[in-house]
């Protein structure tokens, strides 16, 4: 009996250690090879929430929304948000119905949609075509659809949204000021804000409550993606302002790993990092 009680206590303690979320984009190659084994590794690393980035042809990582939801439940992982880069005004209703069926709360537009996103391979820079006014109109329409589907719409930033465009407009500021918060809020990627030389806390103060999910990843001395806690971003000060920001969830993410580090190892380092920093 004493042994059983001890073991139960150990299991309970271990379960209590699970916290935080992981953006599955971090382990996208592993998910493509073996989703179940990869998700088990995510759970074993200590995460309890996930953000998907693998929707195609009505399925998440090759599974129906119901099957994906069931797999996550069996692994004690909670679906929180899903990145849907291929969303259009025509396919949004079906995508959102699938996201809802899979158990997600937030539908995230990760880049300017509908062909507006640009990437310059030569100098590795991102941007957008069209106008920010057009982007705002699209996001407003998507926000209305999300509300009807029982979801909340978020827009995820990179660095270019924090830089003035050819008309002198800072795109992220325009979206924050011109799209109804009942229809659109934001997923702040703390790495890309830092890369753009913007100040997350200044944005929290200017637009309180608008940043519902954070992407948490660090920056090494070369400016590259790094596991949380191993780089130069001052997460402690940012975390002190989480209530002001409106943050409900956060997702560890690392777009690429370097110097032989594998993504499934990087997520373990990052989980230790968020623990040391004080994320819960």
What are these model-derived regions, one by one?
Residues 1-10:
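Bacterial N-terminal signal peptides
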Residues 11-106, 112-113, 272-275, 279-280:
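N-terminal pre-domain/capping segments
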Residues 16-26, 30-45, 172, 176-188, ...:
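Histidine-acidic metal/acid-base catalytic patches
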Residues 26-28, 54-56, 85-88, 113-115, ...:
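Active-site-proximal loop/turn and secondary-structure-junction residues that shape catalytic pockets
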Residues 49, 89-185, 264:
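Active-site acidic/histidine proton-transfer and metal-coordination neighborhood
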Residues 51, 81-83, 108, 154, ...:
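Conserved beta-strand positions in the central sheet of alpha/beta enzyme cores
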Residues 77, 104-105, 151, 244-248:
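A short helix->loop->beta-strand "cap" motif at the edges of active sites that frequently abuts
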Residues 81-86, 125-132, 191, 226-229:
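The substrate-binding groove and active-site-proximal loops of carbohydrate-active enzymes
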């Amino acid at each position: 009996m004493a042994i059983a009680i001890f073991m139960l206590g150990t299991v309970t303690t271990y379960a209590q250690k699970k916290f935080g979320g992981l953006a599955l984009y971090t382990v996208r190659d592993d998910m493509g090879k073996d989703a179940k084994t990869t998700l088990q590794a995510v759970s074993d690393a200590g995460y309890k929430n996930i953000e998907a980035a693998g929707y195609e042809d009505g399925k998440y990582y090759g599974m129906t929304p119901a099957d994906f939801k069931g797999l996550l439940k069996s692994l004690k992982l909670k679906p929180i948000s899903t990145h849907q880069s291929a969303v259009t005004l025509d396919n949004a209703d079906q995508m959102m119905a699938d996201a809802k069926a899979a158990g997600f709360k937030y539908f995230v537009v990760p880049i300017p949609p509908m062909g507006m996103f640009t990437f310059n391979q030569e100098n590795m820079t991102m941007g957008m075509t069209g106008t920010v006014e057009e982007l705002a109109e699209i996001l407003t329409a998507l926000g209305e659809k999300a509300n009807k589907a029982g979801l909340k719409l978020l827009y995820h930033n990179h660095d270019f949204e924090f830089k003035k465009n050819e008309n002198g407009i800072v795109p992220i500021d325009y979206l924050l000021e011109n799209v109804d918060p009942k229809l659109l809020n934001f997923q702040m990627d703390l790495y890309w804000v830092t890369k753009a030389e913007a100040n997350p806390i200044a944005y929290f103060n200017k637009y309180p409550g608008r940043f519902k999910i954070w992407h948490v990843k660090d920056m090494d001395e070369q400016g590259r993606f790094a596991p949380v806690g191993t780089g130069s971003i001052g997460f402690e000060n940012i975390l002190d302002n989480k209530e002001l920001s409106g943050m409900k969830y956060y997702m560890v993410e690392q777009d690429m790993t370097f110097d032989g580090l594998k993504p499934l190892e990087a997520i373990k380092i990052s989980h230790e990092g968020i623990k040391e920093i004080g994320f819960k």
